[in-house]
Swiss-Prot record:
UniProt gene name: proA
Protein name per the record: Gamma-glutamyl phosphate reductase
InterPro entries cross-referenced by the UniProt entry: Ald_DH/histidinol_DH, Ald_DH_C, Ald_DH_N, Aldehyde_DH_dom, G-glutamylP_reductase_CS, Glu-5-SA_DH, GPR_dom
Annotated catalysed reactions: L-glutamate 5-semialdehyde + phosphate + NADP(+) = L-glutamyl 5-phosphate + NADPH + H(+)
The protein's Enzyme Commission number: 1.2.1.41
HAMAP family assigned to the protein according to its UniProt record, in alphabetical order: ProA
This protein's UniProt keywords: Amino-acid biosynthesis, Cytoplasm, NADP, Oxidoreductase, Proline biosynthesis
Organism: Aliarcobacter butzleri (strain RM4018) (Arcobacter butzleri)
Amino acid sequence: MQEFLQEAKNSSRIIANLGSAQKNRVLNEMADALIEHSSFILSHNQKDMNDAKLNNLNDALQDRLLLTEKRIQDMAIAIRQIASQQDPLGKILNGWVTKDGLNIQKVSIPIGVIGIIYESRPNVTSDTAALCFKSGNVCVLKGGKEAENSNKAIATILREVLRKNNLPEYAISLLPDSSREGVAKLIKQDKYVDLIVPRGGEALIRFVSENSSIPVIKHDKGICHIFIDQDANITKIFDIVVNAKCQKPSACNSIETLLIHTNIAALILSGLVETLSLHGTILKGCPETLQHINAIPATLEDFDTEYLANVLNIKIVANVDEAITHIQRHGSGHSESILSENYTTINKFLSEVDAACVYANASTRFTDGGEFGLGAEVGISTNKLHSRGPMGIEDLTTFKYKIYGQGQIRKG
């Protein structure tokens, strides 16, 4: 593995110093190549889908794994959007002159070699490769075993574009050892790798966080909530809740729990249940909720569960403070939303809820690099340091200080 990672590290100097025009041209060629070779990708994806069925992978995971012509087109569009963005490198973030006449500039630079560990979704391969390339970074990708054929096909196409442009193919690499042991070895290679970004299940995140000797930015689970305040606009509630839960239940930005102010619960619960039942949502409720509707009794464990399925907890709360306390206790710091027309309550919620993304009168489903206008994302960071929320190209940079002098020496 060391030889492989040394090649990746050697590539980083070349990639870090590419000009914006060259990077954008190569990215657009990558997008073209994905479309041109879509049948090649789909044939390899079919192998993964066949294996998924044989291994009884659940429907949510199979949906994440599936590629179609439309999804490949979306992958290409995401790469073009990344290419169209402003280059994040070489920006003067700050500058000043010291009392000794030193001209100091704080300038954005690439992080270096980034290891990205992910599961199921093959589009992550092209998204993260493009984001890293645009931001001058080299990526070492470790996808899930269930998507091995798809990931290899996509990486092969992207690497061929690099080769045709006389650029090092190791700038986009799949980890040769895709086993758990391979991951365990990768996350100890701090001599070669500068950052690890794991995105996937809770067990993967915990394993990487506890064992890595390399800095980690986590794409952790999404236990997201919507709080319906007593001053909510009833005409907005139903569409937002259905979108946040039912549009894509397997997404990390879908909600798992609905918190409802006690003063509005009786007015909206029956209508909500009727609407959600039309979408096949399984409901679990707290004792007070069960006084209004028929639902499965919710346990304490349910409020700590990321279902990744069309299941929704409902809890009635006394006020916004109880809602915030519940989110603080059970949320994962991902995305939280309040539905209200009361500015004071909204401001309190947005200020006091500790999460990467906090919304007022909108669905949590917008927590996404594409929806934020970032083109794509490496992940949705639930960390508080370096990066938080959807990680676009700006979040894949660090900085250095450039100091210009005229012969100054330090005295004293």
